[in-house]
């Protein structure tokens, strides 16, 4: 199984890099880095934000074709109930910066799209 572990910032990716032998740089430009640390394992620094995350995922899908992409990091969460290194597993994802409530959509729902996106239960 080919796996890509993605984090926005080098600080979020560092614990994974420290665990593996130095990887081969597959691609690096600006804040974006793709490291191959094993034949079927990639560590990816995507850069911050939805646009960078989407571009990174598209590149991964086209060039690397992973079976699984794991996104890790703070993902914008500053909940005081969470501590550094806590593992939080989501059951669904939603936008946090979309407001079409004036058109009778739920907060975070992009018009004509689902209000949220469930996680693959097999994971």
What are these regions (language model features)?
Residues 1-64:
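N-terminal short beta-loop-beta anion/metal-coordinating cradle
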